[in-house]
Amino acid sequence: MLINEVLDSKSIALSATENASNQMPYLGLQWFPERKKQGLDLSWIKTHKGLPVSLAPSNFDTIPTLRAREGLSKEKTQMAFFREGMTVGEEEMLEIERIQSADDPYLASALSSVYDDTNNLVSGAEVVPERMRMSLLATNAGHPVIAIVSDGVQYAYDYDKDGSYAKDHYAKLTGTSMWSDTANSKPLTDLNNARKKLQKQGKIARYVLMNSNTFQYLLDNAQIRNSILAQNLTATIEVDDDTVVSVVQKRTKLTIVLYDKMYIDDDGKEQYFYPDDKVTLLPDGNLGSTWFGTTPEERTARQLPNVDVTTYGVGITVATKTEYGPPMKMSTFASEVVLPSYENMDSTFVYEVHSEE
C-alpha cells in the first residue's frame, strides 16, 4: 500500500481537527474571528479610525517576537509568511508499504506517529495568530504591536503609530498602587476608573482579561477582602476564586476572564499567551478580525500533480508533496499568511499592574 493512498492533506487536516477538539480553545477568537481574503495586502489591515497598520524596523524593546519562516518583503505585500514542514521517514514509509489492506490493524499504529508529527505542524500554525491577538490585547508599554523577525531584522506591526492609544487607553501602576502591594493597592478602584473612562467615550466594558498569576494579587488584596467582609456578618470568611470573581463583578460590573493557555516559544520555553502583570478591559462583540491571505501553496500547488493541498480551518494551508523516487518520499507543510485587524481597539483599556521599578 502506497502512503499517498492512506495519507493526504485532507486526512491530515481531519486528524488535526479531531486533535484540536480535545484542547482548550483559543480565547482570542472570541474577539477576533477568522476571515479570509484572496491575496491580503497590509493596506487592508485596519486599526482605530480606519487607519492602516504600519510596518517598520522595530524600536520596541523586550517584546516577544514571531519568527517568519520566509522573507518578509516591505516593498511588496509587507505580510509575513509562516511555513513549517516535515518529511515522513523512510522507515515509516516502508512500514506502510508492507500493509496490504486498509483494514489491517497495523495501519493505525503505523500512521499514528505520522499524524502526531503532522498535528504538531498544524498546532504550531494555530499558535501564530493567537500570539498576535494576545500581543495586541496585552500591548507593549501601551502600544499594540506585533513583532516579527525576518532575515535577521526585527519588524513591528504598529497599530498605534500616533501614540493615541497608549495615551488614552493604557496606565502603568507604580509604587503602592501596584497590585503586587496587596495591602495598599486598590484594584476595584482601578478597574472602575478604567471602565468609567471608556464609558465616557461611549464604550461599554464587560470583561477584564488576566491570567491566574495576576488573579492571585486579587485573592490576596486587602481592598477586596474588606469588601467581602463588609457583605458578611461573620468575623472571618474564606476568600476563594468564586468569591473574588463575584465581588469584582458586583463592584465593577466586569466579569473576570482567566486565560492560562500556554505555548512553546522559539527558544523552547513555555510562555503564557496572555502575560503576567497585565489586565485588559474588553467589550462584548468583535474587536477586529483575524485575516488570512492566500499562501504560495494555494496559488501554485494546485497546478502541480504531485502536490495535494487542503485548507485547515479558515486559512491554514496543509500541503503534501509526494516524490516517487526511488526512494519514495512524502513531505508535509503547514503554512499561513495571517494578521489581525483591530478596528475597535478604542473599546479596550490596559493596565500594567506590576513592574520591576
Which residues does each PLM region occupy?
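Long, contiguous amphipathic alpha-helices that act as assembly "spine/axial" helices in icosahedral shell
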Residues: A80-Y165, P187-N213, M328-S335
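N-terminal alpha-helical "arm" segments
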Residues: M1-S43, S341-E357
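Assembly/oligomerization interface modules of large self-assembling protein complexes
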Residues: W31-I99
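Hydrophobic alpha-helical segments and helix pairs
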Residues: E5-Q23, Q154-K186
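Intrinsic-disorder/low-complexity loop/linker signature
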Residues: G50, G142, D151-G152, G163, ...
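Acidic/histidine-enriched, beta-strand-rich ligand/metal-binding domains
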Residues: S177-N213, L219-N221, R225-L229, A235-V239
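Short, Φ-rich (hydrophobic/aromatic) sequence segments
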Residues: A16-T17, D190-R195, P340
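Sequence/fold signature of self-assembling virion shell proteins
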Residues: N221, R225-E357
